[in-house]
Structure formats: C-alpha cells, structure tokens
Amino acid sequence: MSKGVLYGVGTGPGDPELLTIKAVRTIESCPVIAAPQTADGVMVALDIVRGAVDLTGKTVIPVRFSMTRDVERRAAEHASLVRELVAHLDAVRDVALLNLGDPSIYATFQRIAPDVRARGFEARAIPGVPSFCAVAAALERDLTPEMSSPLHIVPGGYDDVRRAIGWPGTKVVMKARRSLADTKRILREEGAFDGAELVEDCGLPSERVYRSLDDVPDRGSYFSTMVVR
C-alpha cells in the first residue's frame, strides 16, 4: 500500500539562492508544505522558499510551538503536529517540513521524525546550508584555521555558553540573543570579548554584521549567530 513520505527540508539560512537543487525539487514534488510560524504570524522558512519555488496550489501547514518550558504543553503541541502530518501521509500526500539551515541542527524535523517512523511512514532529511557557514562567509572568517582546529556548535543559553567558552577552537553560538547580556559579561570575564562577532538575519534583507559586540543593540533578531575565536 502506498504511503506519503515526510521530508525534512533544509532551507539554508535565508538567501533563496542557497537552497540546494535537491531541496527545490523535493519541495516542488510535495503537495503539502509544513513551515514554522512565529507567534506574530511570520514564516521565515516559507518566505525563503517562495523566493525559489512556486507554491501555488500547495497546502501550507503552519507549525507553531510556544516558547514554553511547560513539558506537558510542549508534548501536546508535538503530538498535535505529528497527528496532522500523519493524516496527510496516510492519504498518500508527501509533506515537506521546512527547517531553517540544516534539518540535523536544532531542527523540528529531528524531534518529529521518530514518531512519524514509529507510525510506519518514511521520514527523510534533505540537507541544507547551515546558518553558521553562511555567517562565516558574511564575516569573511575561517572557522577552522588549522586542519586540527576544533569547531563547537553551542545553543545560546547562559549555562551552555559559560560551559563552552573555555573550550579550544572556535565556538559558534546559535540563537545568541537568548542571553546576550550574560554572554557579553562571560566573554569579558574570560578575555574572549574582543574575539567575538555576531550576524543577525544572515542571508535575509535585514542582515546585519557586527564586528564588535559593543555595537550590538540589546534588542534585535532572534536569528542571531555569534562566532567566538
């Protein structure tokens, strides 16, 4: 019996021209598109895709996850999304679940895929350009100056940054806005402030490049990536 397939599609960081050919072809072939939506209705990944793919006639599912620490609420939202996706897959409709950057890096797809597979459906990842690679290009920086140089990807929480700051090599702090003031303080304390740079909304029309954290305003985009050397 035929079944639909769930594709976790990496949309890249923001520039539609950074969508891979495979990502474009996969999205074109899927009648259903699931895309993250913020609380104020913005769908960044979908807007990126619209710059490269004609979505006319496709069903669009907004994916909403509240920024809550309530475990039960998060589990309920997760289960609701799985049910909605499975309903389409069971009707033999392939679904492209859009993920900013790459679907293996802090992505909704990797949290959803095991439950979809457990229900007997395929879930396949379509790689995308990771945001931190585009950030490195925007900064004109080498993330690994030596072949033996370590590279660390760190979520933007206070405790995560404090733990990682002493590690050797380059640290990439994703979603750096989550605790920016605390991160700045930690970097000053550890003597790493002058070696840190930040890019907001990389690849989007609103992109901002900050060579010094002194220039970064307290309020800014959630999509901020910091590079600490």
Language model features by range: what are they?
Residues 1-16, 21-122, 210, 215-216, ...:
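Class I S-adenosyl-L-methionine
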Residues 6, 95, 165-229:
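A contiguous loop/helix-start segment that scaffolds small-molecule binding in enzyme catalytic cores
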Residues 13-16, 39-40, 156-159, 177-179:
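Short beta->alpha connector loops
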Residues 31, 93, 140, 168-169:
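Residue-level detector of structured alpha->beta connecting loops
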Residues 35, 61-64, 125, 145, ...:
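Structural signal for conserved beta-strand scaffold positions within catalytic alpha/beta enzyme cores
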Residues 40-42, 68, 130-133, 180, ...:
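Short gly/pro/ser/thr-enriched loop/turn and capping motifs at secondary-structure boundaries
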Residues 44, 100-101, 127-130, 156, ...:
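Short beta->alpha linker loops
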Residues 104-167, 217:
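Class I SAM-dependent methyltransferase SAM-binding "motif I" and its flanking Rossmann-like core
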